[in-house]
Amino acid sequence: MPPDGAVLAAGQRFDIRVEATSDTAEPPSKLTVTLSGKDITSQNILDPGTNGERGAGGTGTVDGALARLFWAGTAPPNTTNFLKRQVVLTTSGTIVIEARTADGATARVRLTVESWRALASARGGRPAKNIILLLGDGMGIAHRTAARLVSRGLTNGKANGRLAMDTLDATGMVMTASLNSAITDSSPGMSSYATGQKSNNNQEGVFPDNTANAFDNPRTEYIGEFLKRTRGAGFNVGIVTTADVTDSTPAANAVHTSDRTAGAGIADRFFEERATNGVTVLMGGGQRYFMPKEDRGERTDGRRLAPEFEQEGYTWIATRTDVQRLLAASPVPKKILGLFHQTHMAVAFDKVGAGKYSDELARPANEAYRDSPMLEDMAALALKSLSAHSPSGFYLMIEGASIDKRAHAADSERMIWDTIEFDRAVAVALAFARRTNSDQDPSNDTLVIVTADHESGGLGIIGVGNERYAPATLGKAVRDYAAVFRFTTPQELTLFPNYPLDDKGFPTDPDPSRKILLGWAGAPDHNENWVSNRIQQEQAIAQKGETTVSVANPARDGDGPDSDNKTVGGKPIPGFLVRGTIENGETACPDVTVCTADTPSVGHTISGHTASDVPLSASGPGAWQFVGVYENTDVFLKILRASTGNYRVGSDAGLTPGASARPVQPRK
């Protein structure tokens, strides 16, 4: 590692790891490693092993003998390994890493190092001082379209307005595969953007290795780490999410691990590596990993991490009221730790609809979360803090996490509401960028990117409700409610949604007579009654017998008396069974928080990701680079080029030198 074909930015730190495995109990001997013809075998940091050879027999490094960053766990005893940390290549071109053992076995990888800094003969682009990357987790084209149809509506076939994310200057399509799968999970999905490298599913900021330790894998430098190191103390990083802050997407901007579920360990590394990751603003859920069990947390080591952040100058906040207080404060704190939930934050449907069409926050277990901030408020606070304290610029990642999490539950309304909430955060970012990009100072410009890590659920917009078959009218759900274009006479129906809206674009009634109807191609068996659910429920549950399989959850849209199948007015609407297309999994989700995760090791009763390309929209310096179809890893270099003005200006700028512009080679 890195794998063959990897493209690195000139000056970007990365680790080299070589693993030689024997078919016998004895490890291979005399492993030699060369970098572009230069022997670097002596630079192996692993401890001496079999016959005194470093790395032979699976040796790691003695804990405490080297700085924690350079530590490595033990590997299988029939392996000989090489590890060199923090390699930096500054000259562009092709680099060859070759490994050989005494028996003549040879392996070779070719890497490309790409220049990204502005050339002496500048191309005319203005540099981006600040980068704001907004990621709607799992947000494919249909998710964006659904949010527009609901929050803007149609008149005479034309949209009554655009989403904020529809208004950016340039749009392209991103290919989302991970290093080991056509269908990525969120960890390598985000990590590919932030490092320029593919990772295995479940891993972020690292390449795979043969050790069990979750934090010793070979690393690649994140964009925030890179710019912090190269721009200095005046550059800062912000991470804002509606998920647990140790969840895949937020962690894949600052923490290097092969285990996306290592919650407490991930929280530790946010703190312990703050000098290099540059994170001064961290907001979302996940308080459980910052406090011990005896203090409403889940840590088993007794560590009280949140107070440690406070001791290092972070302002620790926990409510929407706290966010509003800091937004009004002058000066605003430079360092902010916002932990607004024990796990993932309350979703927009339940925050906006509390006491009206959602009962989720009325549940006693959720009493502490009734004063939860909206994502737009968190985004505004992050921008206020970072812009005030980052003379060398900042990198800010803002995630709408529960677009994905509610898509996993095939929870149409909650997914749409979270997409609308996310779009309101996009509007906050665009307003900030308009101010910096239109003033008289050419050195403070901002690049805004809106994209997704993958598509979630195989979502399709399958129709608009035909009023004559409305569930509230019939007292039951029928498939004929999903009107597409079946007409007896040309003027018989108007098939445009009719949601009443508040002043923020959220519906005041989630179940109008003509609502949009969604279908999920990547879902297990579930019931459907075309009516929103007042509480969050699993779509499928396990039924234990000789073999454990999952079935559609009768408590969600089923026909039982205890089913959450009622309209806002209280009328029960029994649903019909929708046969799923993916495996139903062997274990039930123990609670809704776990159910809406997408951990590969857990048997699913939830919808899955798909391999569909996802849209990316950009505005600001270098935005035109993002026109076209490209790998998720290409985004990293495009951002770096934008940061120095090293890009072509205008509509011809979509094709830039690099991996995305290379011709397709015939398959051998």
PLM feature segments, named:
Residues 61-92, 111-114:
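Short, hydrophobic beta-strand segments
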Residues 16-24:
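Aromatic/hydrophobic beta-strand junction motif of beta-rich domains
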Residues 113-131, 227:
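Low-complexity, Pro/Ser/Thr- and charge-rich linker/hinge segments at domain boundaries
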Residues 92-102:
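Short, aromatic- and glycine-rich surface loops/edge beta-strands on solvent-exposed regions
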Residues 1-12:
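Short, compositionally biased P/S/T/A/G/V-rich stretches that sit at domain boundaries
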Residues 102-108:
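Short acidic/polar inter-strand loop motif in beta-rich domains
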Residues 47-77, 129-130, 139-191, 200, ...:
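A post-motif C-terminal structural segment
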